[in-house]
Amino acid sequence: STPLYGGTETLIRKILPEWGIGGEPFADGLAPAQIEAALEAAAARGKVSLVYIETPANPTNALVDFELVARSLAAFEARHGYRPVSACDNTMLGPIFQHPIGEGIDLSVYSLTKYVGGHSDLVAGGVTGSAALIGRLKATRGAFGSQLDPHSSWMIARSMETLVLRMRRAAASASRVAHWLADNPIRKLQVLHPQLNADPAYQAVVRRQCSGAGSTFSIVLGGGRAAAFRFINALALFKSAVSLGGTESLVCHPASTTHSGVPADVRAHVGV
């Protein structure tokens, strides 16, 4: 799916092709035709090994329907005789507000740096899934050097004790800020927050697979980059920095930071 976190976009679009691995994006995770078309376009080029999605998407909060992905993969298996592995970047809502594996997705991927770590003091990632799939990942982990150091592992274990409390409080605070921005009388803004998307299909997916809205959202300002940075520089409480899920309130301009490595035409297509 697209958009993805900027680092993931760079991995899929720039690094994996150097290893002979290609990708076929779809932008609307609520549209069966787009998912089917992406699967068939990828299959025409070779074996489809992985369907990788991120929902809600960073930074637009676009959704991908888990049930739709599962049905599309079942139909693909009926046509082609095999089923690609599915994986979801669940960083934005998980592991508290969304559970992809319970909805038919094979692997759930996390930046543990964010909400799970929760204090902006470590860099880590995690993946959950069946014993068979995790066993395959463990077999290659040593070759890629992705073992986490003991101290960071201890800090993650420490942070998980307060994860539910932190995520619920952050989500409640973000909801108040998002609604104030959307309703403020000074300047009308488009606020990309799950509670403020009026599309019935979007809200149906929210009700079905999300138990909360999370605390990361975006706003759309007229005036381009200059207006965005005037807004950022005028804030007093929010710090201009990348990342999310910590105890501080942060704001950033994605096109200049997290998604700066994504080609401009791709950013324009997905609204970043």
Residue ranges, per PLM feature:
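Conserved PLP-enzyme active-site core in the AAT-like
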Residues: 1-187, 192
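Conserved C-terminal alpha-helix-loop-beta "cap" of PLP-dependent enzymes
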Residues: 188-272
